[in-house]
């Protein structure tokens, strides 16, 4: 999934901003640190499939949109 991480991060940021959520908002919903969300958006961190599903659920979108 490493090659797809930057695309995932770009989509995550795009959807988060459309929903007017901060990285802090998303991190609180998921119970993770804000820097983790930042790392995902920058492509510095690789999310597991479970994490992708949790993020999709938190944002109210289908996980397929993110990956």
Model-predicted regions and their roles:
Residues 17, 31, 42, 53:
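Residue-level detection of the helix-turn-helix DNA-binding "recognition helix"
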Residues 13, 24, 53:
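Residues within the helices of the helix-turn-helix
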Residues 50-65:
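DNA major-groove recognition helix of helix-turn-helix/homeodomain DNA-binding modules
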Residues 21-39:
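Short alpha-helical DNA-recognition segment
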Residues 1-18:
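A short, Lys/Arg-rich alpha-helix, primarily the initiator
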Residues 16, 27, 56:
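The alpha-helix within a helix-turn-helix
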């Amino acid at each position: 999934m490493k090659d797809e991480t930057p695309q995932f991060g770009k989509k995550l940021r795009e959807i988060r901003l459309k929903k007017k959520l901060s990285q802090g908002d998303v991190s609180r919903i998921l119970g993770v640190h804000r820097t983790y969300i930042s790392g995902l958006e920058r492509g510095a961190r690789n999310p597991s499939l479970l994490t992708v599903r949790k993020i999709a659920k938190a944002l109210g979108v289908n996980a397929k949109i993110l990956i």
